Swiss-Prot record:
CDD domains: ErythrP_dh
The protein's Enzyme Commission number: 1.1.1.290
Organism: Pseudomonas fluorescens (strain SBW25)
Cytoplasm recorded as keyword: yes
Pathway membership, UniProt: Cofactor biosynthesis; pyridoxine 5'-phosphate biosynthesis; pyridoxine 5'-phosphate from D-erythrose 4-phosphate: step 2/5
Protein name per the record: Erythronate-4-phosphate dehydrogenase
Length: 380
């Protein structure tokens, strides 16, 4: 069996070496010749997998180590009898940690009280749903917009217009869809961007084209009161450098790049592949993860809750280093910048998720206990 896989997928050998030959290739340069003799294709979101790539090949299983499937032609898969799997929720916690770290940076820059702001979460799936749970657990005022879920299930949802009108912070977590009533392509176009409340913080860690990047650049130039945090970009790995310069935080599509998130994605497609073969999985991710580097955090009961929240969030993720690294890469020719974008992702330093953090409170503090619980850290 020949397995062709994106070279940046972690733990390939640990999970897949028992099935056959593994051939690692750069994800952006996958072509028909590369996959023609493959039985299995394992990719990330940088590879578009469609008829043009697969027709005439031996591929019968496609796995993507990502939440989203907008890079997969699922209609063609069905027509061709190709089984497939994504990794829903694999990096959701990492993205939540990214948003929490970004909020701490924004609050520090603006001297804002995070408790006094109204938060809007657009998209309440694996990522957005977890973020909503954390924000509400912290006692913050949260509005949620997700029209497809509002139709399909009961829930306390609001319209996008209400999000724009009422929220001081808007965090985007929608999939990318380009057609139909639920299209999210340029969901935040010039008109909606111009309608943002004064002082709004806009965070996009979903897909780049959910926000019209050219329009956002012009709106940010015209309105210094707005703050933008972008982890995803239209046309990436090519980035609008002028837009990045206007963002308070800019990063190269790494929001979900926690160690657990990346390895969990591989584990999920391994499990799906085992099911495809009709055999039980024999390898567990828990046996492969190293212990957290930060063993424990001790907080005295008298600790200021706001300081404790900031410290716990930043103990697992502080976006300022990624922002600085990314800005240093935005020099030279466009081709050099494209290569640097991919290199930053390929060689991204490992970071851990907050759910692996153990926190001990010395004494009794309901406020601190609530924060630890809301964040999903382990109280000991």
């Amino acid at each position: 069996m020949l397995i062709v896989a994106d070279e940046n997928i972690p733990l390939l050998d640990a999970f897949f070496q028992g099935f056959g030959e593994i051939r690692r290739v750069p994800g952006r340069s996958l072509d028909r010749a590369t996959v023609e003799q493959a039985d299995v294709l394992l990719v990330r979101s940088v590879t578009n997998v469609n008829r043009a790539l697969l027709e005439g090949s031996k591929v019968r299983f496609v796995g993507t180590c990502t939440i989203g499937t907008d890079h997969l032609d699922l209609d063609y898969f069905k027509q061709a009898g190709i089984q497939w799997s994504s990794a829903p929720g694999c990096n959701a916690r990492g993205v939540v940690d990214y948003v929490l770290g970004s909020l701490q940076t924004l609050a520090e820059i603006e001297g804002a009280d995070l408790n006094q702001r109204t938060y809007g979460v657009v998209g309440a799936g694996e990522v957005g749903g977890r973020l909503v749970k954390v924000l509400k657990g912290l006692g913050w005022n949260v509005l949620v917009c997700d029209p497809p879920r509002q139709i399909a299930e009961d829930g306390d949802y609001v319209s996008l217009a209400q999000i724009i009108e009422q929220c001081d912070v808007i965090s985007l977590h929608t999939p990318l869809t380009k057609s139909g009533n639920g299209s999210t392509w340029h969901l935040f176009d010039r008109q909606r961007l111009e309608q943002l409340k004064p002082g709004t913080w806009l965070i996009n860690a979903s897909r780049g084209p959910v926000v019209d990047n050219a329009a956002l650049r012009e709106v940010l130039l015209a309105r210094e009161d707005l703050q933008a945090v972008l982890d995803v970009w239209e046309g990436e790995p090519e980035v609008d450098v002028d837009l990045a310069d206007l963002c308070v935080l800019a990063t190269p599509h790494i929001a979900g790049y926690s160690l657990e998130g990346r390895q969990r994605g591989t584990a999920q497609i391994y499990q799906a592949f085992c099911a495809h073969l009709g055999q039980a999985p024999s390898i567990l991710l828990s046996d492969l993860l190293p212990p957290p580097w930060l063993a424990e955090v001790h907080l005295n009961a008298s600790t200021d809750p706001a300081w404790a929240l900031a410290t716990l969030c930043r103990s697992v993720y502080d976006p300022r280093r990624d922002d600085a690294d990314f800005r240093r890469s935005l020099v030279g020719t466009v081709e050099e910048q494209r290569k640097a974008f991919d290199l930053l992702r390929k060689h991204y330093p490992a970071r851990r998720e907050i759910e692996g953090l153990k926190v001990r409170i010395n004494g009794e503090s309901t406020a601190l206990a609530s924060i630890v619980s809301a964040l999903g850290a382990q109280a000991i």
